[in-house]
Amino acid sequence: MKLIHNAQASKSLRLQLTRGGLALLNGLGLGLSLSIGLSMGLSMALMGNATAQTAAFPTKSITMIVPFPPGGLADIVARPVAEAMSRDLGQPVVIENKAGAGGGIGMGVAARAKPDGYTVLMALSSLTVIPEADALLGRSPMFLLNELRPIARYTADPTVLAVRADSPWKNVKEFIEDARKRPGAINYGSSGNYGTMHVPMEILAQTAGVKMTHIPFTGAGPAVVAMLGGQIDALSTGPATVLQHVKAGKIRVLGHWGNGTLASMPDVSSLKDLGFNAEYAQWSGLFIPSGTPEPIAQRLRAAAKVAAQDTKARDIIQNTGSPVQYLDSPDFEKYVQADAKRMTDVVKKIGKVE
């Protein structure tokens, strides 16, 4: 648009729209009035279009990123939740596994996704650890915690110390005594540095004063397979990941990082009860990019709650050994912030792990 000022007719302001449209406007009042009218009309049209899109949400399939391979807790929870949300939303919710870096790769992809409601994330508690680890190592962050908005927590279980059923260790005492006698000889698998399987083992090692060798994998599924195949000696993971193998007599659980008794493994003692001040919980929860419009965020929040109350979804999750412990968005956000604060100190104690 060109603004033409005629010096001989200073009271007249002419607006010329090049390449068609309005050719000439005479008079300052008329020009400004039409300009304002055009701007308001365009703004209202855009707002109306956005409102219509929000009201119609969703109009296509939604991608649920799972930042770990199949077989681990995030994937175990994500699949029945996605199915239940699909029924409520009237559109498919499609699982996409993006593993690596203790879940950081997939979490980063979700954080950078377009905030339009069509990308959601089923994360584990490593979400509160990885940003702290990035800062400690001085590396470019894979994502920032405030880039993801908590929508719903589904599970929160203490991890368990698991070994093969044919291993020489029948209890935690034997395991720790052997680790003290042979520093670095016992190895354990994890889902990656600073992940939900690495952190609890480091907490135990520091508490017990032992040294073990860490072997990272891309997720709990591959790590369990490696342990069953004799490639690693032990691991810490959620009960849901190993319960089927415990029932089949292939895996023995020595203890857990919680308090009291586990409903799925009532005969397993906590590390605290056995004299080791080691505590850790592996939670799973749904997140969306922080810039997601509020009406869309609330629609996803409602669908996430429906999934938490869905009988089929609850049965599937609970039958794996992880009872549903649902938290709605506001309470889950407080929970995540508290967990992040606690993990700051844990990461500092673990130190740099390349």
Q: What role is predicted for each listed range?
A:
Residues 109-118, 131-222, 271, 276, ...:
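Hinge/capping helix and adjacent helix->loop/strand transition within the periplasmic-binding protein
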Residues 76, 80, 84, 88, ...:
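Extracytoplasmic/secreted proteins, especially bacterial periplasmic and envelope-associated proteins
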Residues 1-59, 354:
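Short, low-complexity disordered leader/linker segments with a strong preference
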Residues 53-147, 185, 193, 209-236, ...:
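N-terminal (or domain-start) structured segment
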Residues 2-5, 32, 53-54, 87-88, ...:
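Short hydrophobic alpha-helices and adjacent helix-cap/hinge residues
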Residues 122-127, 190, 219-220, 237-242, ...:
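Beta->alpha turn/N-cap motifs
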Residues 59-61, 206-210, 294-354:
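An extracytoplasmic/periplasmic, membrane-proximal ligand-sensing/linker region
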Residues 126-137, 198, 202-207, 234-267:
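A ligand-binding cleft/hinge motif common to bilobed small-molecule-binding domains
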